Amino acid sequence: MESVLRSGGTTAEDVVLNLVSMDYNELLMAPSGHASEKALDDMNAEDHILVVNGSIPTGENGAYCTIGGKSAEQVLLEAAEKATAILAVGACAVWGSVQAAKPNPTGAKGVDEIIKDKPVINVSGCPPIGEVITATLTYVLTYGKTPEVDAEGRPKFAYDQRIHDSCPRRAHYDAGQFVKTFDDEGARNGWCLYEVGCKGPSTFSPCPIVQWNLKSGWPIGAGHPCIGCT
C-alpha cells in the first residue's frame, strides 16, 4: 500500500475515491469491528476483484492469524469464491517470502499455493511497484480479462525484461568495470555491481524504468545491488 501511495501518475486517492470501489481494506476503510466484517461479507456476495498482500499462515489450523474468528486461509478462500480476478501483490503474497523460510513455523504460503481452482496474477516485488499494481487493475477493468502472464504468473507487460537490459550501469558491465567493495573507486564512479551480488542479469522487473517514489530512486541507483525480489 505504501508503494501505491507514493507512485506517480494517477494518485492513490484518485484511484480509491474516483476510479474503483475499495470495499474492504484493513488500512484504508472507515468501518471497524462488526461493521468491517459485514462489509467483507457484502463484498463476498458479489463479483469483485480480489487483491491480496501478505503471506497466508496456515500452521496450527490457522491460529497464527485470525480475522473475525476465521483463519486467514478461510477468509482468503471465501473472498476468492466470487472473485473475477485475483492479484497477489508483493513477494510475501506471491511466494511467502521471509515468513515461509525454513523452518517456517507459521506454515506461511503464497496465495497460489492455496487458490488452486482460479488463476492468480502475481505482482511480485518487495515492495512491488505501485504503478504495476494499478496498471494490472486497470488492465482487468478495461479489458474484462486478466493480462498474459509469464511462467511465474507475473504480467508480461511489466515483467518481460531483465533489470540488466535497462540498467544505467550496463555500459560498465560490458566494459568489464566492476565494483569490488562498496568503498572502492568503482563504487564512487557508479560502476557495475555484479561482483558484489547484483541479481539484475537474472531478475525480470521494470525497476530501472519506473522506479519508486515518483521516480526519485531505486536500489541500484542508490548504489545497492539488486537482490532479485521479483
Explain the meaning of each model-derived region.
Residues M1-G197, P201-P206, P219:
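Iron-sulfur-associated redox domains of electron-transfer enzymes in respiratory
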Residues P206-W212:
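Short Cys/His-rich Zn2+-coordinating modules
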Residues W212-T230:
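Extended hydrophobic packing segments that form well-structured cores
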